[in-house]
Amino acid sequence: NAVMLGYNTDVEKDGGVALGADSVASVDKDIAGYDPSTKLASANTSAAWKATHAAVSVGNGSTATRQITGVAAGTNDTDAVNVAQLKAIAGGTGSIHFVSVKGGNASSVNYNNDGAKETGAIAIGANAEATANSAVAMGFNAQSNGSGSIVIGESSGLIPDASKRGASKGNSSIIIGTENVDKGGTKEHAGSNDGILGSNNTIQESNGAFVTGAFNHVSDSYQFGQLSASEQQKLAQAMADGKPLGKYIGKWGSHVFVTGDGNTVSQGMNVTISGSQNTVKNSKSQTVIGDSNKITDRNAGTVSGKQEERTKNVSDLVIGKGNDISGNDTYMKGYESLTVIGNNNKAVNPSSSIVIGDNQRLSAIEESVVIGSMTPEEKADPDIQQKHASVVVGYHAQSGTGAGGGMNVALGHGAKAYGWQETVTGIKSIVEAGDSGYDGYLASVYGGLNTVASNKADQNDGMANTVVGTLNKTEGANGALVFGAGNSVTHSFGTAPTDENGKSMDEYWSDAILVGQKYAMGEGPLGHDELRKAMGLAMSTGGGSVVTMGNGNTSDYAVHSQIIGSGNILTGTANTPSINNTINGYANTGRNVERMSMMGTGNNMSGSTADVVIGDYHHKDGGKNNVILGSMATEKKTVEKTYTMKDASGNVILEKKYKVTENVPIKSHTANISNAVMLGYNTDVEKDGGVA
């Protein structure tokens, strides 16, 4: 059945046709044609792809070849294609401009346009590979291994290990940029719904994370909760209605959003970062804006077990640079949030507070408001910390110490409240703390440069002191009330009664007063009336309870006494304090006196008991139960005095003599007189019981 037409022709297969001189027909029937889509012989067995008869040859393929001319364009699948048809195809591809792919060598993946492995997949670029349904990989070394995922960029990829790939891993993620990698992970939906835009970013064992920038890293931030039947029904209805789906997919994805450079998120959930070099680890519901902030273990385990409740209800907010927040309140209630705005603040196990400022050290802070800044040196001092349930406003202002304290108000530049439940309002005013938890307890200071000092020896030092004014001081005193400027109350403690067993009642009252800490937080067994009663009894008996009102008054070793005026002095001794005295006026002095009432100017009483003095310039030593009304004769004298200035260490740095003109009494009263009455100008009694 062969046809051989022409000189030196030959047919080597049955039914072959050789046309023209030197033609050889050597191709048999049943030979499949070349499929350009696969670059292999076609697997199609139809007559259009597989010949039913041996081939027709017009040459021998080497020394004899011929053009077939005058061929019209074919119509059917088995018709020949002419050059006109090929030109038309070339013209169609030539209409695409500015598209060029320059790859490596023939061994590169996708060299043979085979990088797209699954249905609907697209791979463009040398070594580009799309191995999942509808995946897109575009760029040199681009890898897209998740269904419906898009990877665009050099050496970027959604590339979970082949052994870990699954139907849900890496799905619907988008990566755009250079050398970005989403490694997926072992979890069912790891790598799904992620987004990366930038360069050198990494996501691993996470889902629902979105990263923009460079050199960011997100890991172990994964959530895929199951919807309830009701939620699934609502979601389906919302999808059918074309409504937003956000509120139905809160259980899906980590909701981690990172914008910036060099940020790290590990074990995060509902985390938003904007900035550079920030770190969030084992912490959920965090918003971080700024640079070099570090938040760790905000979701550490707790005794209360409410850390996940906190995640649902609130979010921490950190704005600034260099802030370091670690740990949480082990007894949290589930609604605590921390707001830090500033730079280089450090908080360990914080709860719910608001901090605005720089270089603050916060120790287990809870329900506090801190506005102001410390220096780096102050931050480095472990004794300078802000404590819980406090309001602190001002540069260098402080509530509590490293050893304890808290629940204070400190308002003003350098205001310090070191103890418990203190109120300090004023520039550089301070309530010191001692060795006892009672020191400075419930003290109140209003004004600048006041000090409620602790001598570190007396328990209850500074308790319930009230200071209003400026440059006043109390030390070794409790229950003191100071109003004015330049006043001093020192060594002022009372003696509380004892119970039937000889135990001081002050212990019972102090224990009750301390319950005020719980009362302030809405807890504890005692109400306000019981606390008030205990405080009243403690201060009226065991308290020093010295009241000074005016300027430049001094009380030392005096209790249960009152000074009103200016320049007055009331003193006693450690063994026998002056007690139950009243001084009203100017420049009066009482030394070692008891139950004395003095009103006037320039009086000086020493060692007297139950004397009443009304008038000016009475000087008397000893005696008791005297009544003096009137003024003594005086003369003006120039008196030389010395002003000595000392530094904080007690060293004399200045000493100046100066002179003043004063009224000086011409004579003093007879000493050690008792039961006398002196009525009128310049009177005196020389015998007990006398009346002048």
Predicted regions: what is each one?
Residues S57-V58:
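A sequence-level detector for low-complexity, Ser/Thr- and acidic-rich stretches
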Residues T52, S62-I89:
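Extracellular repetitive beta-rich solenoid segments
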